[in-house]
C-alpha cells in the first residue's frame, strides 16, 4: 500500500456510513449515494463504487475535483458538526482514477446493466431533444438521454 492509498483509506474510514445520508440527500444536487460508494471503495470494490457513482453522475472525474464540496455534500456531512467533514471530493476522485487504471468506463458499466433498460430504450429510440446549457447539468442530461437512445442537442 502506498502512502497516498493509506491517506485515502484513512479518509474513507472517517465516514460513518449514516443511515439518513445528509451528504447525499441534502448536500449533493445529483443525489450521489455517497456512503455506499465510500463503503465499496473501503472494501476495495472499485467497480462497485464506480457503478454506484455512475448511476447519478457521468462526470465523477471532474465533479470529484471541482464541485463545491464544502458547500454541498461535505457541508452536510454529520462529521462536520464537531470537526472536519469527510473529504468526499478526494475519495470520489480516487475512485474515478482507480476505475480508469482498471480499464473501467461508463460504456462498459452501461453495457453491463443495459438489459434492464431495453424496453425503455425501444420506446425512446430515435427521439430528439434540445438541452439548454453545456455545463455539467446539460452534459449529464445529454449522456443519460444518449444511454436511452435519445439524440440530444446542447445549446
What function would you assign to each model-found segment?
Residues 127-153:
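N-terminal Rossmann-like FAD-binding beta1-loop-alpha1 element of flavoenzymes
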Residues 1-123:
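Ferredoxin-type iron-sulfur electron-transfer modules and their immediate structural context
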